[in-house]
Amino acid sequence: MLQRASTAMDMKLEHVGKAALAGALAVGLAAAPAQALTKSQLNELSYLQVKGTGLANRCPEVVGEGSISPKSGQKLVDMCIEPKAFAVEEEIGRAGKTEKKFVNAKVMTRQTYTLDGIEGTLDVSGGSIVFNEKEGIDYAATTVQLPGGERVPFLFTVKDLVAKGSGGAFKPGFQMGGDFNTPSYRTGLFLDPKGRGGTTGYDMAVALPGLQSGVEGDEELFKENNKTFDITTGRIEMEVNKVNVEEQEIGGVFVATQLGDTDMGSKVPKKVLTKGIFYARVD
């Protein structure tokens, strides 16, 4: 049975603010990566020139350090969000104590994990800028691997993002951040290896039907049968470090936290941390 719940799981997201963004800058995310191209340079390339190069998974570079003062009703368009580093929160045992710590992970997904074509409205009032995400390629199924070999799937996304920043202009040092929704990694039409799904498939696996009802306390089997569509909450913080006034472009770095896959309600999700760069154009 498909269950929607906008607050299906409570998240205690670690505060990601200026310190995290400073860390992203310290590891060189703000620097122009090798082979980075501007939007105009990318537009000049043909399909065959882009094919197989990985450029389609890259965000454009912004050149300049000016200032753009948007007005209410304008939009941010062509937004691109490219993760450069991934980490997963794990429990680390040391000296008889257990602590939670983010462990660096390796991305296993081929070059299809960058969000692109995102757009949304801008609201400028009271000395602040608010960005409301509306549409675009705003989610990407991604899998990362921990040092021990465990793989963690998650839906990299910024769906329904509402990001707010203090100030009336996009300029180097401008920061904005907010919460977004993270839909389920799987949809209701997905069938597990035993043919069970959220909106289709079997209600339960064969054998031991009495235990699978949950009545007799077999919670693990019940969760495997009772598929849910969990919507959780993530958070992203962004800092502008490049502004091209002539092209009305902004670029910078971001740090985001969100929950990973719940396997449709049958397992506890892991917290995933992503760091990278972003690009957008004021329209």
Across the structure, where does each feature detected by a protein language model lie?
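An extracellular/secretory-lumen and virion-surface interaction module
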Residues: G28-D283
